[in-house]
A protein has these predicted regions:
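Conserved ATP-binding/catalytic motifs of P-loop helicase motor domains
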Residues: 1-219
Length: 219
């Protein structure tokens, strides 16, 4: 930087500080309110989508207004349906609604292509520092764990809502590793609102059983 005439910074902001600066300011919150109004105008919810939107936002409101130290479980919401049923549109509205309220959220997806649909989204492997494995390297008896660094742990600790698109397309070992991570990463277990979207018709019956087992035991 000094080569181009810029002063050398005394320190670099942490990941949490970067996220707060980017999303938790009045200008950005107003932009998200405008975005939400635009989405509602161009792609209004049908009755089922509106019920889902209100139910999830009420759950998020109750969760974020509770004492986090007294919570004892995650809250899961799943938006399911085949392509063209409005999952992505509803997801975008929920993101905008949360950010317009100044909530700190994070968004991940099963693939890079899916992550590109949403502002600030990354792949689930990237968010949770979980390595991409070849199928022959997977060992169910000794599952791979998430390798979260200090800055990412600090950021996740302050997050209220985790949005996860194409949830069912991820390997079950990743999902189990994430849930185990939140039990052991900090001195006390930390709980979150998970809002997941996907199409169960896209996975085999065996994979569906694995996903549903993980999902049901953590409701």
């Amino acid at each position: 930087m000094e080569k181009y005439g810029f002063p050398k910074p005394n320190s670099l902001p942490t990941e949490l500080q970067c996220e707060v600066l980017q999303w938790q300011n009045e200008e950005e919150m107003q932009r998200q309110r405008v975005l939400l109004a635009s989405l509602n105008s161009t792609c209004p919810n049908n009755s089922e989508q509106q019920r889902a939107f209100e139910s999830i936002m009420n759950s998020i409101h109750d969760f974020t207004n509770a004492n986090r130290e007294e919570l004892t479980e995650h809250r899961f919401h799943f938006i399911g349906g085949p392509g063209g049923t409005g999952k992505s549109a509803l997801f975008k509205k929920l993101h905008a609604a949360c950010r317009s309220l100044g909530l700190l959220i994070t968004i991940c997806a099963a693939t890079t292509l899916a992550a590109l649909l949403f502002d600030g989204a990354v792949t689930a492997h990237s968010l949770f520092d979980y390595p991409v494995e070849d199928e022959e390297d997977v060992d169910d008896l000794n599952p791979t764990q998430c390798d979260i660094k200090k800055e990412r742990a600090e950021f996740l600790h302050e997050v209220s809502v985790i949005f996860w698109d194409e949830f069912v397309s991820n390997d079950r070992n990743l999902m189990e590793a994430v849930l185990d991570l939140f039990e052991t990463l900090w001195d006390e277990p930390r709980y979150f609102v998970f809002v997941c979207a996907g199409d169960f018709a896209q996975v085999s019956s065996h994979s569906l059983l694995c996903v549903m087992t993980i999902y049901m035991k953590n409701i």
